[in-house]
Amino acid sequence: MQANSRAFFLLIAVIAFGLVGYALYLQHVEGLQPCPLCVLQRFAFVGIGVFSLLAALSSATRLLWHGLGMLSGLGGIFVAGYHVSLLLNPKASCGIDPIENWVNALPTAKWLPQVFESDGLCTAPLPPVLGVSIPLWSLIWMVILALTLVVAMIRRERR
């Protein structure tokens, strides 16, 4: 598949939306409540998905959407990395999280609370998936998607 092609961006969007779908499965079927950092990671995956979908649909503004998708991924890497660091050092987390108040005050938490409302604790122990913590999986996928978009941008610029 050619980087920067319509199919490339559609694949990135499907993966990103699929990961959000899996997060919703974990929340609504398995009963795992998302913490504020989980919700921010959902925003990043949704951003990657939406901007990749827009890049697939519009060749005239593809570069803009591609860049915004990369920025969403890089922001997601930062949030997921911070989340993993909290799990490695749970004493760094305090009981009341000001990020939760901010996330739950966003309009999206009111419009789609089943997707964007935060009720969990960032350091709560979660069952691993295939032996890996859920925040680490999020970081891994965020790196894969962001790096794929960055490499595609570099290849595009070399042409």
Swiss-Prot record:
Highest taxon of the lineage: Bacteria
Cysteines paired by S-S bonds: C35-C38, C94-C122
Keyword Cell inner membrane: yes
GO cellular component: plasma membrane
All ranges on the Cytoplasmic side of the membrane: 1-8, 58-63, 156-159
Keywords, comma-separated and alphabetical: Cell inner membrane, Cell membrane, Chaperone, Disulfide bond, Electron transport, Membrane, Oxidoreductase, Redox-active center, Transmembrane, Transmembrane helix, Transport
Gene3D superfamilies tied to this protein: DsbB-like
Record localization: Cell inner membrane
Bilayer topology: Multi-pass membrane protein
Periplasmic compartment spans: 26-43, 82-136
Main location: membrane
A GO term, aspect molecular function: protein-disulfide reductase activity
Keyword Electron transport listed: yes
Gene Ontology biological process terms, A to Z: protein folding
Transmembrane annotation, as ranges: 9-25, 44-57, 64-81, 137-155
Xref: NCBIfam families: PRK02110.1
Task of the protein: Required for disulfide bond formation in some periplasmic proteins. Acts by oxidizing the DsbA protein.
Family label: Belongs to the DsbB family.
Protein name, per record: Disulfide bond formation protein B
Organism name: Ralstonia nicotianae (strain ATCC BAA-1114 / GMI1000) (Ralstonia solanacearum)
Gene from which this protein is expressed: dsbB
